[in-house]
Structures are given as C-alpha cells and as structure tokens.
C-alpha cells in the first residue's frame, strides 16, 4: 500500500501540472472503487485547480467550489501524460487538463477512492487523524505521552492513524530498526530517550524515502511512470532470511495484526 512518502511523491509530481490549469472534463471508465466515484467528479467541467495538498495518505485537490479527495488504496498510482495514450485495463480515471496534460489514475485492485466534499473539515475520512509525522507537533515528548499507558506492541501502535498518520507497514518496520527497538516491545516500555530517538528516525526515514521517490515493491509508480527507489535502501522490510546489513544476523519475519513485520533479533531490543 502506498504510504506517506509515496503519496507525497505523487503530490509533488502532479502539482506543477495541475495548479493554474483547468480541468476540462473527467473521464471515468470504472467508478466502482472502494467507494463509488462521487457524482460531482463526473460533472467536472472547466474547473481550475487551485492547489494540490496532502493530509495523511490522502491527496487533496482544491477547486473553487470544493475538494477532490484521492486515496491510492492498495495498488493505486497517478501519472501525468502529455498525450491521450490508450487506456489499459486498470486505468480507471482521467482528468483532462487545459494545458494538454492528463492526470491518469491506475488501480489494479480498485481499493482506492475519488471523493468530493464542499468542506474538508469534518469529512469522515479526514476526521480523528493524528498529527503529521513531519510536523513539529510530532516529537519525542508527544510520543512519550501517547505511549505511556499503551499496553500494546509498538509496531502496530505506530501504524494507528490516531497516533500519527502515514507511517504504514514499511516505514514502521524500517524506523524501529533504525531506532534499535524490537517491534514486540510494549509501547509503554519505551524510555524518554527511546521516544526521542524514534520520533527523530521516523522523520529521517520518511524524508529519505521522499527524496528517493518512495518505495516501489509492486504497483506504485511516480507521476512520471518511474518506480520509487527507496526499495533499494530497505534495511529489514521484505528481507526475511537475508543477512542484516549491520550485523549479519538473518532478518526475521512475524505478523502483527495480520501485517508482516521484519526485524533483526540482534540489533533490536
């Protein structure tokens, strides 16, 4: 599933081609996504794009009368096309722009979403979200307070959007490795120093992935059709049985809440 770096990479890639241009029309080939494509999107015509923003794993296209909320789901990606290339099987949505560009949404598993709202505040998919991990609000003290009485393993807790948004399976595993924290540790067992370190490395891992265009394991592509290159730098995720890049111990894979977790028995305590 695309996580924060992949969504932010998409945002940065499409923003220059959309902001200041006008949506001439939307071409919806298959509106049966996780939720049906909103009727308002079908009716878009001569509508300028004012900004392209991101909240958690949602892309937000600001229009004069409302917002398009896009979620990439499990396998979605957005590409900017310079011409109307023939659509393939999983190309479900096109936004045809006044500058000759086309924003094309591809989603093999159709778990994504294209929604419409007049106001962002209070929309059900955006309500009750925790802070952005790259914001000043997310720091060691915040993490310490939230973990203090939490009797659950730290790995699934990091993936809870009420704690912090956008830290999915890949980056939770990678951040815990970078901090030397075992994924089975109770959140409440983390010391002040460990919370400070974990908050810092989460930011560093996410920023590094954004610099590399995100992580492509299967379906994700950047807006120019290229893969994300952070997969080449993964320390533990997807490396079951391979030697730890630090100590040589084979990487272990387990499951937390039906999600794969990867770690090094020697480096993480």
Swiss-Prot record:
InterPro entries with a match to the protein in the record: DNA_glyclase/AP_lyase_DNA-bd, DNA_glyclase_Znf_dom_DNA_BS, Formamido-pyr_DNA_Glyclase, FPG_cat, MutM-like_N-ter, Ribosomal_uS13-like_H2TH, Znf_DNA_glyclase/AP_lyase, Znf_FPG/IleRS
Catalysed reactions, semicolon-separated: Hydrolysis of DNA containing ring-opened 7-methylguanine residues, releasing 2,6-diamino-4-hydroxy-5-(N-methyl)formamidopyrimidine; 2'-deoxyribonucleotide-(2'-deoxyribose 5'-phosphate)-2'-deoxyribonucleotide-DNA = a 3'-end 2'-deoxyribonucleotide-(2,3-dehydro-2,3-deoxyribose 5'-phosphate)-DNA + a 5'-end 5'-phospho-2'-deoxyribonucleoside-DNA + H(+)
Required cofactor(s): Zn(2+)
SUPFAM superfamilies to which the protein is assigned, alphabetical: Glucocorticoid receptor-like (DNA-binding domain), N-terminal domain of MutM-like DNA repair proteins, S13-like H2TH domain
Stretches assigned to coiled coil: none
UniProt-listed Enzyme Commission number(s): 3.2.2.23, 4.2.99.18
Zinc finger region(s), FPG-type: 235-269
Cofactor comment text: Binds 1 zinc ion per subunit.
GO biological process: base-excision repair
Alphabetized CDD domains for the sequence: EcFpg-like_N
Active-site residue list: 2 (schiff-base intermediate with dna), 3 (proton donor), 57 (proton donor), 259 (proton donor)
Positions with a binding annotation for DNA: 90, 109, 150
Domain of life: Bacteria
Alphabetical UniProt keywords: DNA damage, DNA repair, DNA-binding, Glycosidase, Hydrolase, Lyase, Metal-binding, Multifunctional enzyme, Zinc, Zinc-finger
Gene Ontology MF terms: 8-oxo-7,8-dihydroguanine DNA N-glycosylase activity; class I DNA-(apurinic or apyrimidinic site) endonuclease activity; damaged DNA binding; zinc ion binding
Family membership noted in the UniProt record: Belongs to the FPG family.
Function recorded in the entry: Involved in base excision repair of DNA damaged by oxidation or by mutagenic agents. Acts as a DNA glycosylase that recognizes and removes damaged bases. Has a preference for oxidized purines, such as 7,8-dihydro-8-oxoguanine (8-oxoG). Has AP (apurinic/apyrimidinic) lyase activity and introduces nicks in the DNA strand. Cleaves the DNA backbone by beta-delta elimination to generate a single-strand break at the site of the removed base with both 3'- and 5'-phosphates.
Subunit details: Monomer.
Name this protein carries in UniProt: Formamidopyrimidine-DNA glycosylase
Species of the source: Salmonella agona (strain SL483)
Taxonomic classification: Bacteria, Pseudomonadati, Pseudomonadota, Gammaproteobacteria, Enterobacterales
Gene designation per UniProt: mutM
